[in-house]
UniProtKB/Swiss-Prot annotation:
It holds the Pfam family PGK. ADP binds at residues 306, 312, 330, 403, 427, 433-434, 466-467. Its cofactor is Mg(2+). GO terms for biological process: gluconeogenesis; glycolytic process. It comes from the Eukaryota. It comes from Trypanosoma congolense. The gene is 56PGK. GO terms for molecular function: ADP binding; ATP binding; metal ion binding; phosphoglycerate kinase activity. The lineage of its organism: Eukaryota, Discoba, Euglenozoa, Kinetoplastea, Metakinetoplastina. Keywords: ATP-binding, Glycolysis, Glycosome, Kinase, Magnesium, Metal-binding, Nucleotide-binding, Peroxisome, Transferase. ATP binds at residues 312, 331, 403, 434, 466-467. This is Phosphoglycerate kinase, glycosomal. InterPro entries: Pgk_euglenozoa, Phosphoglycerate_kinase, Phosphoglycerate_kinase_CS, Phosphoglycerate_kinase_N, Phosphoglycerate_kinase_sf. CDP binds at residues 306, 311, 330, 428, 433. Mg(2+) binds at residues 311, 466. It catalyses: (2R)-3-phosphoglycerate + ATP = (2R)-3-phospho-glyceroyl phosphate + ADP.
Amino acid sequence: MSHVTGVTSNIRIKKTIDDIWPLTAKRVLVRVDFNVPIQNGHITNDYRIRATIPTIQRIIDQGGICILLSHLGRPAGISMTTAVRDVRRRYHEAHFHDNKGKTAFFSVLPPEEKIKILAQSSLREEATHIMPGVKSGKTILFARLPEDEKKQLLMQYLDEKKDNGLPQLSVSAGYEEQYSLRPVAVRLAELLGQHVYFAHDCMDAKMELSRLKRGNVMLLENVRFYREEDSKKEEEREAMAKVLASYGDIFVSDAFGTAHRDSATMTGIPKVLGHGAAGYLMEKEISYFSKVLGNPPRPLVAIVGGSKVSDKIQLLDNMLQRIDYLLIGGAMAYTFLKAQGHRIGTSMCEEDRLDLARSLLKKAEDRKVQVLLPVDHVCHTEFKAVDTPVVTADADIPDGHMALDIGPKTIANYVETIGKCKSAIWNGPMGVFEMTPYSKGTFAVAKAMGDCTQKNGLMSIIGGGDSASAAEQSGEATRMSHVSTGGGASLELLEGKTLPGVAILDDKE
């Protein structure tokens, strides 16, 4: 077993939301990571939303006004200047064109504004039967009105709004429905047990924000609808950050999943405001990674899987300075096995990384890190699920076969090693766990970590991404010490890198 000395974590402990007082009547901007999977308007995994509830609840309980910012997916986005021109064009059409533009303009108003307009129309009785939500027929009803009445209603509406700023449009040139955070607002309201206000345009929300009272929560629409969020030009990120920073008094980051990004909302807002604190989720992430990379209970095992050695070079190089055991699985294991002279059939292998694999194994030997590689495999001739895959007798894989999971002997070795340890960090699956015949290795590792956490007090950390998904699917996630919400962010921390979204927050004195 290795004897690691003199290695410290480069993660500094940060001020948290508990260090900010009072929150009463303060507008608290909270950058969260609500990048959740959505299919047909339904959220299929709400873990990231649930993980932020303690921070949001703290602000509500203290009488603060909680304003949430997040991204979702990778929409094409538009620039801020394009958005301004688009809004002006829509208002121009609504005002000055007799026979076009009015229904299009009405269609992009928020649902509650549409209801108000229809309530004053000649079709008000029919309007009373329309549900207040989206896609309930409001625009279709408005389209039936005579053109003169449409114009009169919209002119009256715009005149009422002129003192408070023009109404917010629910759809702009950058809007893509599949990336809208509206379903997240609905789910968040269910979890909180209170209404969550929704601003349809994150860059044009001042009027909506002015109506919020103590204890209210508002979610702004996807910040990536604007290209400035992730612009490579600092001045563009800063321009967006200045607008968003004007919405709040205090900045809190609970978005560990995007802490590796130097974006307008992650680093730009705290730069503009001159401060930033960690939410409870961010605090927990920092705390666990600081422990495992600094002075963890020993022995410490790293379980590393995934497709490519090249994706994990920096992680392996950094962790070999810190760990006692290294368990390797997934497709990357076959590059190591071939480097040792084993036959690997048609299994995935990075031929140009064989020397690198040998050097990493030599480095582990020099540092007295015990490396365990698969000693048997679950194989098939094709990349598909079958009822009776081939299980090899040893580490060699037959010609014409590809390994798709670790075998039962390897599982036993890995489970035994995890049982010897006091700390464990896992990044990357052991096989193609999405296919049931090849999920046993990954799920067995998850169960071993869960069992040892509950029975032996193992400090177990899942490094986000596919490992977190596997822990969830296996039912073991709640038995771990910590399941990270950040795949890319946790990987960069394990590589020894500094995360911009963490570094920008105020250090705890």
